[in-house]
């Protein structure tokens, strides 16, 4: 709880999060703005090594999940994972249990300032998954 207590709780600050966060981090926020649910996934049984990478999965709508992983583009997959790390670093995400995360109150607040249309091309990297 010490780490939660030390998190920023307002967007008023000395720096601009738009400058601090990568486009991948902001894309994750834009995708998560409605539900705020994020988890980290891996497919350890895949033959392809890039499919075994850790990947960010966002519940963008109820029962709609976006997985930011493409075996054909491992570099971009890693950029989205790095974007998630940035969200954690800035207190925009809270860790719950195991692989489960959510936006923090500050994360929801900042996500709602973003225009999803600005991230349409980045969102195309993600694939919709069933579970």
Model-based region annotation:
Residues 47-77:
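Short helix-coil junctions and helix-kink-helix linkers
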Residues 100-104:
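Minor-groove-contacting beta-hairpin "wing" of winged helix-turn-helix DNA-binding domains
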Residues 70-90, 95-97:
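Short amphipathic alpha-helical interaction segments
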Residues 40-49, 120-121:
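A composition-biased, non-transmembrane "mature-region" signal
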């Amino acid at each position: 709880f010490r780490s939660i207590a030390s998190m920023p709780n307002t967007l008023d600050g000395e720096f601009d999060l738009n400058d601090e966060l990568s486009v991948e981090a902001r894309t994750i926020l834009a995708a998560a703005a409605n539900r705020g649910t994020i988890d980290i996934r891996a497919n350890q049984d895949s033959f392809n090594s890039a499919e075994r990478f850790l990947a960010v999965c966002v519940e963008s709508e109820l029962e709609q999940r976006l997985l930011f992983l493409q075996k054909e583009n491992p570099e971009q997959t890693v950029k989205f994972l790095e974007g998630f790390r940035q969200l954690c670093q800035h207190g925009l995400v809270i860790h719950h249990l195991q692989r489960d995360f959510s936006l923090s109150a500050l994360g929801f607040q900042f996500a709602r300032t973003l225009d999803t249309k600005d991230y349409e091309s980045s969102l195309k990297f993600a694939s919709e998954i069933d579970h």
